Amino acid sequence: MAHITVDDSENLEKAIKRFKRQVEKEGIIREWKKKEFYEKPSTLLNRKKKALRRKLMKKGRKVSDSRLY
């Protein structure tokens, strides 16, 4: 959970920006959007398989590109 302390002398706008950065860094909004709607287990599995395939393709391209040099 994002938690910041605000001093009396600190500008409120600056504190809000710092809070937003902290929330972004921790991935709270991203996680909330993922869990906003129910996702069937089969759909979840398909999405994970697709992400894994994409990751392996990217890794394969990286390896083949490095061999060219």
From Swiss-Prot:
InterPro entries: Ribosomal_bS21, Ribosomal_bS21_CS, Ribosomal_bS21_sf
Swiss-Prot/TrEMBL keywords: Ribonucleoprotein, Ribosomal protein
GO CC, alphabetical: ribonucleoprotein complex; ribosome
Gene Ontology biological-process annotations: translation
GO molecular-function terms, A-Z: structural constituent of ribosome
Any matching Pfam family: Ribosomal_S21
NCBIfam families reported in the protein's UniProt record: S21p (TIGR00030)
Family: Belongs to the bacterial ribosomal protein bS21 family.
Name assigned to this protein: Small ribosomal subunit protein bS21
